[in-house]
């Protein structure tokens, strides 16, 4: 069994790798939203994608989701949960540094709850007869244009509209508080 302790980031998503012996690599992404930890994970062997899992862990109410990973068996998810309160939309907006009207706060609470419920619905999808694939659109990869740098012709016009310039860089406002740097 593999146990992963909680990892907290102040913003954004966390991506981590975990090797569990052999040639399997477990990769997971997780997001923290107002005390709710959403995650998506998959296990990949050297030959193909093995399993995909979605879930959530609530830290504000009695809700627990545990996943057991076995090389020989599919993932098994055990859940014990209770109805949890809607996320604090005002706090989420403050963390994202966006302003919301009282009407928007009222509208977004149920919508965020629906997203969390959607993760639960994904657990019920039967994928036993689905061929493993890393990408769903492998045919489109051959149609991509070559990745070649392009020189912008009107650079001086673009630079003229920049408020602060420290050659050769464009200076932008800080987005993190000084205590977080």
Curated annotation (Swiss-Prot):
The keyword Zinc does not apply. Keywords: ATP-binding, Chloroplast, Ligase, Mitochondrion, Nucleotide-binding, Plastid, Protein biosynthesis. GO terms for biological process: glutaminyl-tRNAGln biosynthesis via transamidation; mitochondrial translation; regulation of translational fidelity. The keyword Plastid applies. GO terms for molecular function: ATP binding; glutaminyl-tRNA synthase (glutamine-hydrolyzing) activity. Signal peptide: none annotated. It is found in: Mitochondrion; Plastid, Chloroplast. GO terms for cellular component: chloroplast; glutamyl-tRNA(Gln) amidotransferase complex; mitochondrion. It holds the Pfam family GatC. InterPro entries: Asp/Glu-ADT_sf_sub_c, GatC. It catalyses: L-glutamyl-tRNA(Gln) + L-glutamine + ATP + H2O = L-glutaminyl-tRNA(Gln) + L-glutamate + ADP + phosphate + H(+). Its EC number is 6.3.5.-. It comes from the Eukaryota. Belongs to the GatC family. Subunit of the heterotrimeric GatCAB amidotransferase (AdT) complex, composed of A, B and C subunits. Allows the formation of correctly charged Gln-tRNA(Gln) through the transamidation of misacylated Glu-tRNA(Gln) in chloroplasts and mitochondria. The reaction takes place in the presence of glutamine and ATP through an activated gamma-phospho-Glu-tRNA(Gln). This protein may be expected to contain an N-terminal transit peptide but none has been predicted. NCBIfam families: gatC. PANTHER family: GLUTAMYL-TRNA(GLN) AMIDOTRANSFERASE SUBUNIT C, MITOCHONDRIAL. This is Glutamyl-tRNA(Gln) amidotransferase subunit C, chloroplastic/mitochondrial. It comes from Picea sitchensis (Sitka spruce). The lineage of its organism: Eukaryota, Viridiplantae, Streptophyta, Embryophyta, Tracheophyta. The gene is GATC.
